[in-house]
Structures are given as C-alpha cells and as structure tokens.
Design a protein with these regions (language model features):
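Helix-turn-helix/winged-helix DNA-binding modules
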Residues: 54, 175, 192, 196-197, ...
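Core residues of bacterial helix-turn-helix
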Residues: 207-209, 257-258, 269
Length: 289
C-alpha cells in the first residue's frame, strides 16, 4: 500500500494510490481523518458501515453492493453514499477517485462551511465543481476547501426536501429524509437491475421501520408522490430505454420489468407514452438512420 499523510490546521488527510490494499471493512482506517483514494485498475474495497463516502469513476465502472441492492456507476457519474456498509469492485480498465471518512469528520467539515448542513446522499452527475475539486484533492490538500462547498451546492435539491419531513428536531427530520432517500435508491437499483422479483410498499416500509401507511403519507408529503408512483415512473423510464436503445424482444422486457404479461406491458407502455412499443422502436430506428 502506498500511502502518504498530510496535515493542515484542521484535519489529517491520508492518500492511497495503487498498488494499495485497504484493511478489511476499513477497521484500521483512522476515524479522525479523511481518506482519499486514487484508484486505477481492478480493485475491491469494503468500507465501514455508517461511513459516508464520495465516489467518482473517471473511466470504466464501479460495481457497488450494499444491503438489499447492487448497482453500477459508470465514468462521468458520481455518488455520495451514506446508507450502511458498502462493497465496491472496480473494473480493470477503470480510473476512479473516492473520499471516505467517519461521520464526525464529514459533519464538522459541512457545519464549518454552512450552518446546519450535513452530507446528504445523491447519485448522478456530480457537477463541474465536485469533479474539479476531487481531481485536485488527489494531490492538493487545499482542494478540500473547494470540495465541501461544491458538495453542499450539489445536494441543494435534496436538502430542499428536508423542511417537508416530519420530526420534532432537525436531527429527526434529517433521519426521516435519509430513510426515504435510501428507499428511493433501492427502487432505482431494483429497476436498473431488471429484477422481476416483487418489491412493494410493505417490503419498503419494513426496511425503513415504518408502517406501510405512514411510509405512503410521508413519501407523498416530502416528494409529492407515493412510493408506488415513483416506482412506476422509474419502470416506465426503464421500459422506454430498453425499447428504444436495445433490440431486446418485448417479451423479454416484459419479464425483466416484472409485468404480469406482455399485453399488460404493452397497455402500460401505450398509456405512458402515447404509442406502442413497436412504434417507439421504429421511431428510434428511423432517427438512428
């Protein structure tokens, strides 16, 4: 393991560069420090439960696995994760950056940058600010002062949901939001994996330790839709992607997305998009030509 430690007035920052071998489950990582990983090529990492982490694959892909979910991050995407233990496997052609620390390290950094701020989970386009700051942090401690404000800006849309959460204190409302965001992530992973196994409100509610009725009410109050509404939107978007961007038979798409029958899928597709799957595929082929 190649590692260097750098100090400034506020924190210790450890850098890990290939070849490296992080301790299993991260149990030997210093809990009062930042850990920056500049990865290249195949690698497998196991991170401690409850440690937030930021992931940016620059090239290739990262296969992520947590309780009840597995998903893939591709080059150009990013994710801030804080929902339990995480296993990460990097592809052999990958180049990626990660920032890992104990919750107290993250919380102090966010609170010092903006009152009442705390890292919130997100997945998708990291934005130029986060991307550039992480690239710089791989070799420059001072880039952390740029990264934290960029992360706060990146999570602004997520943080806007916080006042709509129920709870007597800010900590209670934040905990409710984290639970809901994790459930939405589980639904997204389920649809992306084309998993035809059953996923329903009672199953989701059990993961968040809510009753089904309470979950429905809270999710609607925070996001303006029920969990079922959100799952339907995700499945519709996935159906559109598979129909338009692959040559997968409709019968196979039906099975992968968990529809009861091909006719049920075709009815749902036409209701959602105003055209049949065949018409959508022909339109895509015409555009490609």
């Amino acid at each position: 393991m190649a590692r260097c430690a750098d100090r400034n007035d506020d924190m210790t920052l450890h850098r890990y560069v290939p070849p490296f071998s992080l301790p299993p489950h991260g149990d030997a990582l210093a809990a009062d420090s930042w850990h920056v990983i500049a990865g290249r090529g195949a690698a497998t990492l196991q991170l401690p439960a409850h440690w937030p982490s930021l992931w940016l694959p620059m090239r290739g892909r990262l296969s992520m696995q947590a309780q009840d979910a597995h998903w893939t991050l591709f080059g150009g995407e990013g994710q801030l994760w804080r929902a339990g233990a995480l296993n990460v496997q990097a592809s052999h052609e990958s180049r990626w950056l990660a920032l890992v620390a104990a919750p107290t390290v993250w919380n102090v950094a966010f609170a010092n940058s903006a009152d009442d701020e705390e890292p919130l989970p997100w997945r998708g386009d990291p934005g130029d600010g986060v991307h550039e700051a992480m690239e710089a942090l791989a070799h420059d401690d001072d880039a952390l002062a740029l990264l934290i404000p960029a992360l706060i800006d990146r999570q602004r849309d997520v943080a806007a949901c916080l006042p709509r959460c129920r709870g007597r204190t800010l900590a209670h409302r934040r905990q409710a939001l984290l639970r809901l965001l994790n459930l939405r992530h589980l639904m997204q992973c389920h649809v992306e994996a084309d998993d035809d196994a059953s996923i329903d409100v009672p199953w989701l509610a059990s993961r968040a330790h809510y009753s089904p009725g309470h979950l429905i009410r809270l999710h609607r109050a925070v996001f303006g839709e029920t969990p079922s509404d959100y799952f339907t939107r995700l499945r519709q978007a996935r159906a559109w992607e598979l129909v338009r961007e692959t040559d997968m038979p409709v019968a196979t798409i039906t099975h992968r997305l968990g529809f009861e029958s091909q006719s049920a899928f075709c009815r749902a597709f036409k209701h959602a998009f105003g055209m049949t799957a065949t018409q959508a595929r022909r339109e895509a082929d015409a555009c490609a030509a």
